[in-house]
């Protein structure tokens, strides 16, 4: 897939290629090459797609029709414009060892950072710091929304959306300590987000969980 500023995106959570939006797809492919080298060689290197560097410094490279190596955003632009290269990504979606790397990187880049993020809220003029979001939110529905927002908005963007809703509902419920926040009505928090958010992407992600049947209990 290719959209917005991402240049090129791929995978079940749409890892993004462009550096401007985090370049998570670079890290995914680097993880694939490190942890599943044979499959990466057979599927990606075979068509000229490779990686350089590791972790946050990882970049994807590709050999163009003239044998010139493009890297980073230039590589993603070239891949985006050459539909024949899409086949490698489609094939990777059916290779278990490479699918496993999607799960690994989704957990590393989004799930754990979101659930372990420190949340600052203000209740009745008192500022409280929740050490980890997962100390307060425990239901399958709430955690699904939090992770979905972190993927779409970034962990910082997710927290900026979540904090005022927590503050509002906690004030209404008179929950004035971190321990008391564990009794918060999780569904009401996200109903507040739907009622106050201006970003349709946020609203749609919350509503999709509301409509999924996942439990807030």
Show where each model-derived region lies.
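Cell-wall polysaccharide-cleaving catalytic domain and substrate-binding groove, primarily
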Residues: 1-217
């Amino acid at each position: 897939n290719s959209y917005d500023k991402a240049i090129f995106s791929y995978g079940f959570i749409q890892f993004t290629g462009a550096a401007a939006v985090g370049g998570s797809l670079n890290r995914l492919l680097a993880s694939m090459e490190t942890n599943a080298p044979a499959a990466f060689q057979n599927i990606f290197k075979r068509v000229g797609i490779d990686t350089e560097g590791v972790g946050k410094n990882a970049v994807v490279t590709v050999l163009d029709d003239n044998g010139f190596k493009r890297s980073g955003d230039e590589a993603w632009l070239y891949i985006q414009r050459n539909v024949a290269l899409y086949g490698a990504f489609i094939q990777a979606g059916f290779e278990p060892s490479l699918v496993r790397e999607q799960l690994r990187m989704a957990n590393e880049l989004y799930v754990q950072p979101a659930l372990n993020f420190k949340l600052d809220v203000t209740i009745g003029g008192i500022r409280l710091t929740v050490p980890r979001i997962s100390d307060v939110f425990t239901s399958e529905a709430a955690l699904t929304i939090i992770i979905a927002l972190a993927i779409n908005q970034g962990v910082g963007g997710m927290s900026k959306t979540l904090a005022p809703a927590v503050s509002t509902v906690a004030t209404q419920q008179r929950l004035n300590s971190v321990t008391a926040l564990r009794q918060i009505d999780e569904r009401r928090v996200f109903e507040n987000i739907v009622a106050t958010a201006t970003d349709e992407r946020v609203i749609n992600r919350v509503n999709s969980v509301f409509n999924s049947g996942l439990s807030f209990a």
